[in-house]
Amino acid sequence: LGLGSSPVSLFELTRAYAIFASSGKLVVPKYIRSVHDRDNELLLSSVVLRNNLETQVQDSSETQTNVKKADGDQILEESEAFLASHLIQGVVSHPRGTGRRAKKLKRPIGGKTGTTNEQGDAWFVGYSPNLVTGVWVGFDSKIGLGRGETGGRAALPIWLEYMESALQNHPVLEFPVPEGIFFA
């Protein structure tokens, strides 16, 4: 399933990528809404969402059941989360990757660009080992953003500016390599 091929909210995407960044653990997401007045005084910030944290998981008999999961619960094997994250980091680290601008942060970053049909929406969801952020650019109505307005061009610069500020006083962290993962 490619980003932009079916309706998925920014909330859902960011929450999913947080599982990779946290070595397979469920993370209770926050919408970060910041409202500043004309003097740049912060009027509103972080709101924690705690409603409807049910997740579909498969039990040993391969049937689906609703099981309540809490913040920090291991919902994906560490090795699986690491391998997925390692692949997603390629979007940033590869010289022609659509997220290559994020290399500017000079730290390990995973991320994925996304553009819906006819440039109606542009996304970038990216993460370091300790922070996951998603950016969506688009209109509430079905108006296109314009030719060439992709996730890498429209959303990634916003994400990058935010992450530069958010991570500037934090140490550079590596994604932890779980037991059983070896590099040749």
Segments from the language model and where they lie:
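A penicillin-recognizing enzyme superfamily signal
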Residues: 7-184
